[in-house]
């Protein structure tokens, strides 16, 4: 049995792991356009329920992930000068790059073939494959190419967001609501490893325009967010990595 997986992100790699475990004799190959250690963004977050599923379906990768993650039980909400902490909400954060390397190594252990810097633009090359898995991300070219078959519904939400990072340590999943002269901004922040945290900034389209963010470079946008959230960053810098402003798409 031949299985081709297009896309070597976390979803494609985890699919490869589970398929190879279920079909040990199958030839499973993952095709990824980027290099093995390329990654965009910063940390990813998992709930306790997701961790339970990781442990259930592949204990070896689960234990490696939990060896690397930052764990917290609280949500801290900063609103109008007050802080509300709510316990009992277990989450963990993990570096996206670390997660990819863990899953790559686990897939190799099982005998999965990983081909990097291999851009697939036509799935017809896999005509002999018994199964093709499309895991090429939220902007999947294959989903668009076969729109008539898959019939996806893409709802582009109105709010703008930018994904940044910081060296600011955090002890809780942190939400900050900050009112500015232009309108409200929200920061969603969490630590994913020692010395590193993810900061996702969100605002409505009207506030986005009034704040002059349209057309700004990534660094200029980071500088503006650092000014707005200065008291929460506490002197720590904001980091960028493809941190352009975009809209949340909901895909069904």
Per-range role (PLM):
Residues 48-163:
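Conserved N-terminal helical subregion
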């Amino acid at each position: 049995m031949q299985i081709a997986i297009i896309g070597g992100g976390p979803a494609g790699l985890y699919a490869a792991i589970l398929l190879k475990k279920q079909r040990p004799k199958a030839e499973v190959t993952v095709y990824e356009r980027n290099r093995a250690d390329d990654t965009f963004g910063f940390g990813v977050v998992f709930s306790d329920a997701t961790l339970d599923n990781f442990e259930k379906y592949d204990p070896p990768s689960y234990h490696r992930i939990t060896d690397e993650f930052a764990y917290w039980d609280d949500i801290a909400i900063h609103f109008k000068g007050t802080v509300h902490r709510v316990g009992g909400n277990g989450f963990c954060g993990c570096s996206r790059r670390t997660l990819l390397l863990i899953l790559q190594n686990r897939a190799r252990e099982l005998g999965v073939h990983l081909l990097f810097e291999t851009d697939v633009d036509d799935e017809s090359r896999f005509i002999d494959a018994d199964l093709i898995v499309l895991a090429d991300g939220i902007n999947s070219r294959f989903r668009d190419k076969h729109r008539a078959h898959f019939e996806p519904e893409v709802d582009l939400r109105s709010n703008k967001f930018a994904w940044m990072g910081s060296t600011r340590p955090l002890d809780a999943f942190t939400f900050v609501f900050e009112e500015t002269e232009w309108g409200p901004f929200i920061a969603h922040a969490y630590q994913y490893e020692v010395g590193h945290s993810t900061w996702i900034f969100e605002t409505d389209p009207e506030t986005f325009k009034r704040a002059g963010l349209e057309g700004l470079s990534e660094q200029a946008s980071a500088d503006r967010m650092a000014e707005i959230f200065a008291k929460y960053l506490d002197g720590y810098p904001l980091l960028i990595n493809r941190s352009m402003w975009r809209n949340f798409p909901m895909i069904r």
